[in-house]
Amino acid sequence: MAHYLMHGTLHATVYEVDKLHSGGISGFFGKILANVEGTIGIGKGVTQLYATIDLERARVGRTRIIKDEPNNPKWYESFHIYCAHMASNVVFTVKDDNPIGATLIGRAYVPVEELIRGDQVDRWVEILDEDKNPIEGDSKIHVKLQFFDVKKDSNWNMGIKGARYLGVPYTFYSQRRGCRVSLYQDAHVPDGFIPKIPLAGGKYYEPHRCWEDVFDAITNARHLIYITGWSVYTEITLIRDSRRPKPGGDVTLGELLKQKASEGVKVLMLVWDDRTSVGLLKKDGLMATHDEETANYFQNTDVHCVLCPRNPDDGGSFVQGLQISTMFTHHQKIVVVDGEMPSGESQMRRIVSFVGGIDLCDGRYDTPFHSLFRTLDTAHHDDFHQPNFAGSSITKGGPREPWHDIHSRLEGPVAWDVLFNFEQRWRQQGGKDVLVNLRELDNIIIPPSPVMFPDDHETWNVQLFRSIDGGAAFGFPETPEEAARAGLVSGKDNIIDRSIQDAYINAIRRAKNFIYIENQYFLGSSFDWSSDDIKREDINALHLIPKELSLKIVSKIERGERFTVYVVVPMWPEGVPESASVQAILDWQRRTMEMMYKDIIQALRAKDREEDPRNYLTFFCLGNREVKKSGEYEPSERPEDDSDYIRAQEARRFMIYVHTKMMIVDDEYIIVGSANINQRSMDGARDSEIAMGAYQPYHLTINQPARGQIHGFRMALWYEHLGMLDDTFLEPENIECVQKVNRVAGKYWDLYASELLEHDLPGHLLRYPIGVSSEGDVTELPGTEFFPDTKARVLGAKSDYLPPILTT
């Protein structure tokens, strides 16, 4: 049957099944299940029917469970489904849930051919068995479907069209106007680092300093300090730049929070309870979160610190529940405080929030210099972080692992949305109700209100997005209808906020010229990976972001227009690079890149163009290499012989860890948050995440390129990574720009990987060390099977024992 590209939005309604014969599960499997239920005391012999929606084999929707309606289950549920899939059928599967999985009742098929032109299909469809024969009793399912092609969407390729843009639709939080946003590159930027970057209106870009601002915000709070983190470490200090000291700046984070709590400020912390500490990953050098130490530190103090496991929503099976609580994390990184009014004159207070990728823990403090060896006796002497080598320590010396990250401060109405997110999470998992009652403080803390006038050219519109479910957030609606109205997705008995993925999809679809991504991971859209040695349906990394990116590039090639996507990822995901988990993730990353390059090459060939696909999609990593200087820290011990550690120390090089979770579109729109480009972060029912999407309505790419704060921020990042500014960087979509960036990054990679080192690396942006064949296969760069100083394959390796759910 012919496959069609369904790129757009599918509206689907699942009504009911007319009649199911006999009900229940008969035969051999039913007997086994009855024994299991009897033995472990879960479940009873009632039917628990639900339906799923698939585009071929990619699951895109599921209804709630209807209990004890064996003959005529009625769901009446509607779905708004983003799709970017090749499919011949929309498949509806009816299943009976049970404690260890589910039993297939049958499947109904609606050909995509009938939908692709946009016609509405509303009908009863026959339910068939595995052999495509009608099931006993000739049952039918009533469904309604309508497909909306992306190219007919008024926002497709249009960017943000000024005041008419209302934000990402179908989301829990709506767009807020009159906000202020501060963007942070790294935890700290030293004075004089950023050169003059011109902005609109004769202004120049001014960098902000994340940990200084967090320190000030906590220090100046009077009523509340709310913190969530994947990890929070009490022993770090936030102020470390000797040229920018602050009163009390040498105090540790733990002491600062205890001090504020003793002054009567309500200090509440939700820190992920690393319950198994994910045993399979632990030995690969991952996950040292200090959760127990942090909880013990605050015991018997005025600080309320709750270790918060990633509990499943109640709807999953017994097996799924085990998966969620042992495999997934709370990943949001937020600080919410009350702050003084912008003028500083009034006694009134307002809410200020921080959202992004930087946890308040060890290993995170860094500057755009990202030194490997030169801060080991100063800023990093008591904060030496190097989890990629077994047995690494400050006594054995560098290289430490430098940390590149991005964060934001939000002021105005959106700051309250971050506060409400914290309150929802605290009420669900925080235990005691000790939240500040803001109604009682309404004469002190102003209600959500703009902090910028509508005609101020520096105003921002901001929208908050999440990946979270009812297991982690209190007060989600109970029914699918209410959930849909609140911009939530209903699952198989859980309610999910998946708006971060929606925000990325919408931003990519709107994009006109270029996209710049920095992310700790880059894998997904597994429904379209090549299936030579895997069963695609077992992977389930189904989020759409990589596919949306390649389809955007393809659409531009078809129209004869320039478009470039730049992606910066770490050399490898943090951990011992030879380990099974790191190698598995690199393998998924390779498959993702390959899928995208094949799309691009196919589109170029259709236009009879033989061109380097890296002119359209190009991947980078960050690294540093430093010559030895006199007066440097001298370690008292030495790493093991023939280890990655000693080789990296002698070669004086290491990757800069890209922990960022950011996307910039056309210099007019930015997403910053905690969510990685992988299934864990984008799913909604796996890791909990938070992100913001923002733009300045006076700085849009309508008649000329945008030259507001987002443009300045990107140029500052490119200066950090490339060690230079260039006029070609002003228009990243142009062939001159992408070729220059690729050329410079290629040169820097050669210097990084070379035997000898005469000078410091002039910049940090390195070509990601892969090649792309004429067919789109991702190959080794000649002579680069392994990352320098390691025995770790650049292209990764499939793991035979780690389940994909853990590494995707």
Curated annotation (Swiss-Prot):
Molecular-function GO terms, alphabetical: calcium ion binding; phospholipase D activity
A GO BP annotation: phosphatidylcholine catabolic process
Chain residues that bind Ca(2+): D186, H370, H404, E720
Domain PLD phosphodiesterase: 326-364, 654-681
SMART domains associated with the record: C2, PLDc
Cofactor: Ca(2+)
Active site annotation, chain numbering: H331, K333, D338, H659, K661, D666
EC number(s) recorded for this UniProt protein: 3.1.4.4
Record's cofactor remark: Ca(2+) requirement for activity depends on pH. Active either under acidic conditions with micromolar levels of calcium (PIP2-dependent) or at neutral pH with millimolar levels of calcium (PIP2-independent).
Residues covered by the C2 domain: 1-125
Gene Ontology CC terms: plasma membrane
Keywords: Calcium, Hydrolase, Lipid degradation, Lipid metabolism, Metal-binding, Repeat
One Pfam family it belongs to: PLD_C
Binding site for a 1,2-diacyl-sn-glycero-3-phosphate: H331, Q520, H659
Superkingdom of origin organism: Eukaryota
Reaction catalysed by this enzyme: a 1,2-diacyl-sn-glycero-3-phosphocholine + H2O = a 1,2-diacyl-sn-glycero-3-phosphate + choline + H(+)
Free-text domain note: C2 domain is a calcium-binding fold, and the binding promotes the protein association with membranes. A lower affinity toward calcium can be anticipated for PLD alpha due to the absence of two potential calcium ligands.
Family statement drawn from the similarity comment of this UniProt entry: Belongs to the phospholipase D family. C2-PLD subfamily.
Family annotation (PANTHER family): PHOSPHOLIPASE D, PHOSPHOLIPASE D ALPHA 1
Role of this protein: Hydrolyzes glycerol-phospholipids at the terminal phosphodiesteric bond. Plays an important role in various cellular processes.
UniProt name for this protein: Phospholipase D alpha 1
Gene: PLD1
